[in-house]
Amino acid sequence: MPAPEGATTGAHEAHRANEAQRAQKVGIFGGTFDPPHVGHEAAARAILSDLDLDRLLLMVANDPWQKSPTRPITPAEDRFAMTQALAESIPGASDSRLEIDRGGPTYSIETVEAVLDQASREGQPEPQVFLVVGADLVPELGTWERAADLARLVTLAVVSRPSTPRPAAPPGWDVRWVDGPQVDVSSSKIREILARGGPVDGLVPPAVMLCMARRDLYAVGR
């Protein structure tokens, strides 16, 4: 017997309401993205899949305190444009300029609190936040700004290559491991190749390459 007229619509509306009240699983994948590369892309796809996230924020650092004293950083707006191009090619990923708009040095605890505050202002349930880091950073977690508060607020999503050792996190951290891509690429390597006028085909996603050329970054297209 067919459902009464309007019953299907009502069921869909109820489903949407339930989804709106379900706490989302949100990942924060922060980085300098100078430039974004195929390793970032592969890692983002693996994180979304392995952790079954509702969304993954590609968070562009405004002033990465670990790096800015050691080398010139490409302007934040250019790095955001490249990251935006990358995010548009990954279902479930979105770019975020939260740290750029906040200004100043980048600290993970402030970013996490801002994401939680935004959900609260929008009337959403508090999301489960997954903070993405590389395995090399795990031993340093205890030195991070307000590390104890950060450990309380997030699940750590640690990306590592399947064949590499998994260092132990300091006490108090909830850790999930994600097998990262077997890709031998880094932003610094790409910058070095481009500075020599060499090709980076296969190292940078096509959409990012197009953005680099349009914005005249790293001498691409000259």
Per-range role (PLM):
Residues 1-222:
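Nucleotidyltransferase catalytic core that binds NTPs
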